[in-house]
Amino acid sequence: MEGKVFSGQKLILVMLLLGHLHGFSSCIEKERKALLELKKFVMSRCEECEYDSVLPTWTNDTKSDCCQWENIKCNRTSRRLTGLSLYTSYYLEISLLNLSLLHPFEEVRSLDLSNSRLNGLVDDVEGYKSLRRLRNLQILNFSSNEFNNSIFPFLNAATSLTTLSLRRNNMYGPIPLKELKNLTNLELLDLSGNRIDGSMPVREFPYLKKLKALDLSSNGIYSSMEWQGLKNLTNLEVLSLGYNYFDGPIPIEVFCEMKNLQELDLRGINFVGQLPLCFGNLNKLRFLDLSSNQLTGNIPPSFSSLESLEYLSLSDNSFEGFFSLNPLTNLTKLKVFIFSSKDDMVQVKIESTWQPLFQLSVLVLRLCSLEKIPNFLMYQKNLHVVDLSGNRISGIIPTWLLENNPELEVLQLKNNSFTIFQMPTSVHNLQVLDFSENNIGGLFPDNFGRVLPNLVHMNGSNNGFQGNFPSSMGEMYNISFLDLSYNNLSGELPQSFVSSCFSLSILQLSHNKFSGHFLPRQTNFTSLIVLRINNNLFTGKIGVGLLTLVDLCILDMSNNFLEGELPPLLLVFEYLNFLDLSGNLLSGALPSHVSLDNVLFLHNNNFTGPIPDTFLGSIQILDLRNNKLSGNIPQFVDTQDISFLLLRGNSLTGYIPSTLCEFSKMRLLDLSDNKLNGFIPSCFNNLSFGLARKEEITNYYVAVALESFYLGFYKSTFVVENFRLDYSNYFEIDVKFATKQRYDSYIGAFQFSEGTLNSMYGLDLSSNELSGVIPAELGDLFKLRALNLSHNFLSSHIPDSFSKLQDIESLDLSYNMLQGSIPHQLTNLTSLAIFNVSYNNLSGIIPQGKQFNTFDENSYLGNPLLCGPPTDTSCETKKNSEENANGGEEDDKEVAIDMLVFYWSTAGTYVTALIGILVLMCVDCSWRRAWLRLVDAFIASAKSKLA
């Protein structure tokens, strides 16, 4: 009987246990439905999203346990939701958040709505008190949204909050701490990356009595700061004020009285002076960042008391002269030390016998005038990152660092004077190695890839390596970035490398002596997005293997000996943004269709035939100079983005089409050295040449989908220090344009619109057969820096409107048929450095003053009617010559008058004699009879002769 009872009890327990376990199988139904409503909210703001692609585990399946969904955490016992994140990688429309959507999550403790494109909060029922419904909410992350100060009244109702992050929003003006006075439990407040300015009301911080961590970095200008009030934050352990600009001196002693500080971030706050002695009193300090200031002097001895210090950064300050690291000797917990100078004015002095007690994880001594590897590194065994770039270290590359530090991941030695590369004796797991810009010569090590097979980034450019490309490089299966440009390497690329490095994303081998056919067969470079092999000796046609690299974004094969036609397939790669095939032997006709978005360089080849009407497409920079192209400039269709159109040195004929005037984003237009005729279109003033509104100016961004190499080596409360490689700096555009009587290179960065290229605006129509007048409308292009109309048949006058070209630096109108005087108003062109009007028919006085006083007589040759400096022709002599010419004209007029008198006097004499004869005949009859007989005799004689 007892056995049956016992068995029954066990059965009941099993049933209860099964029922209990069944309760764990699913989340709360109300919360599951609420999560699906949140997903609908996200979907409503994403036009291109499909339902299954956004938060795909959040499904309508009733059997699906929402506690197992992504971005969700639940209590193991109650199955209530405790953690929620709405993060998605999709681009969402900006929207308000209705807080009532969150009310079903009554037990939620952590709410992450960062990166959600939210710009405000709303609740039509409970208003500002809405968040009080979430009575257990402790962590609220609203970072990287579009919120402004209007959300503070809502936040004040979340009285249980301990952590509040409003990083990277649109907060502005003074910090409205009074509106957060009910958040008495708040321990961490992050307001970094906003636009907070004005005064910092430190006196209001006592509302937040439990505050331990405060981040106000990267905001703006604090016009005033109640510095002394910081001392009242007695519980504060973490303070970040980095990258703000404070008016007036900073009383650094205030920080010295905050005895509980463990992390202090004062980067980039314009801190001037020496390192404070009193910092040595902060014996709890673990993290201290004073980089990017104007600190001088040396590390004070009091720093030796910072027994808890793990992280110290003093980089980018104004230290000069000798700099000693001796005060750091006894800091046994120091893991990260970062030091670099701004302008190589400091010399770090490290005694050969110095043996500190710490074991570093990260050491950066960049631009410190070091002449040898510090000896203390011989005793470091836990290094992960070493950066000794920009020094004067010579001799052998210190590969013993790899042998002593098996966990070393990053070794930066660029821009030194190393001469010998010696490989480690055993295989190492190093991931980043940069020894570029040294003086290393000799053969490149054959076993390089076998000893360092795990390299992700390798840069050995700008050295003197010789010999062939090592076949062992094919064993670096993880390599993503490889740069051996600017060396003397030769031969062909080994097949083992071409067929094995499928992770390679960036390959740069330019400025070497590599030869042979490039990629004649298919390769395994399936991840390649940047390929630069320019300035080598490659020959033959463009290889079949190259045409399989469909993910390429940047391809530079310029200045080789490639021949044959341009494969049309190459110009329709989906992601290709930059293609440079200039300086080769390519020939044939241009393809009719191009899908490139940005840059196409085909100059200095042998292309023939016309330019297709559809050739431009979405290209922003097109360079076809110095080919053998013929025909008219086409009526380009379906193009709006062209900014640089360079067609110099071909055999183009016909008129300049007026459709060019529709290129409203034009910056450089070079049609010189062709056979164009007709007039210069007066509509050229429609071309922007820098006149476009700011938002219309093109950003020459080449999208490279390669993630930067990232290695986090220290994480504090607010600052995550890391080693990062940014590859965008490798990509630049170089455009040559004739100005100031020479060809200059104008450089532009792809991503950031930096460099001289983005400030250059020019028009070159020289060496053609253009005729007619110079349109006055060209004077409206007041951003032009270079204008060249020389070697044409232009006539009439120099337009007075050219005086509006305020930024013009080079103006060349030589070898035309221009007449009249040089407009005096041109002396107001204060930027003008080159002015040439030689070999025209100009006359009058040469203007003087300002920039015109700098031009020599070569600017005016071949204009005999011009006078004044800098020519030898005096305007006074010219005036006398003109007066003499005027005197001759008066003599001619007098001669003309004398002849007129002669003619009139002769006629008068004849008439007078005739009248006298008639009078005598009337008075004397004998005279009349004699006259009549004479007339009759004359008539009779005439008749007889006629008979």
From Swiss-Prot:
One of its GO terms (cellular component) is plasma membrane. It comes from the Eukaryota. The chain crosses the membrane at residues 900-920. It comes from Arabidopsis thaliana. Its main location: membrane. Disulfide bonds: none annotated. SUPFAM superfamilies: L domain-like. It is found in: Cell membrane. Residues 1-27 form the signal peptide. Residues 28-899 are extracellular. LRR repeats lie at residues 105-128, 134-157, 159-182, 183-207, 209-232, 233-257, 259-281, 282-305, 307-330, 332-356, 357-380, 381-404, 405-427, 428-450, 452-476, 477-500, 502-527, 529-549, 550-575, 577-598, 600-616, 617-640, 642-663, 664-686, 757-780, 781-804, 805-829, 831-854. Glycans are attached at residues 60, 75, 98, 141, 148, 182, 232, 330, 415, 459, 478, 488, 524, 606, 686, 788, 828, 836, 841. Belongs to the RLP family. Residues 921-947 are cytoplasmic. InterPro entries: Leu-rich_rpt, Leu-rich_rpt_typical-subtyp, LRR_dom_sf, LRR_N_plant-typ, LRR_R13L4/SHOC2-like, RLP_Defense_Trigger. This is Receptor-like protein 56. It is a single-pass type I membrane protein. Keywords: Cell membrane, Glycoprotein, Leucine-rich repeat, Membrane, Receptor, Repeat, Signal, Transmembrane, Transmembrane helix.
